[in-house]
Amino acid sequence: MSAAATREEPAMHDPAITQLSLVRQLKFCAGHRLYRHESKCAFFHGHNYRVDIEVVGVNGGTEVDSVGRIVDFSMIKKRMLGWLDDNWDHGFLIYEEDDNALAAIKMVQPTKYFVMPYNPTAENMARYLLEVVAPNVLGDLGVVARKVVVWETDESCAVAALVGDASDLTTPLESAVLIDHRM
């Protein structure tokens, strides 16, 4: 009998073999500028962003509920898109050290802007969503965001992914969304 014939096939649901995750795609529109950028991204401009958020169960993605899901897709949409709509959609993302942009945006009435603890690059936006937003809005659903992809264009994206235990995350400086409805 050959060695191949004596090997046992792994069980269909062996957690050492199968890891389950789900990805929810979200879309929003926002403007930004990149502080100290050497080219045209230093100007105020906007994008139709797409965000892909991948989540696994807190158990590592090896278990599902009685329906067979990690979590219902609609819960990811409700929580994450709700946050995006409230904070970033149709607003400007401004780096907290960009005094010129902050002064300019405050002159426009009404206005909506979100102050970030770092330059609002696609990389930093993905990082912020992964490290700050997802743990706060998804934490009680029994899932952990493992990866966030922020698409600025159909051809260009940035990826932030967890490489360690989610409990090791440190929260960056507090950020704030500011909406001024005065006319």
Q: What residue spans do the PLM features occupy?
A:
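Charge-rich, low-complexity N-terminal segments
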Residues: 2-183
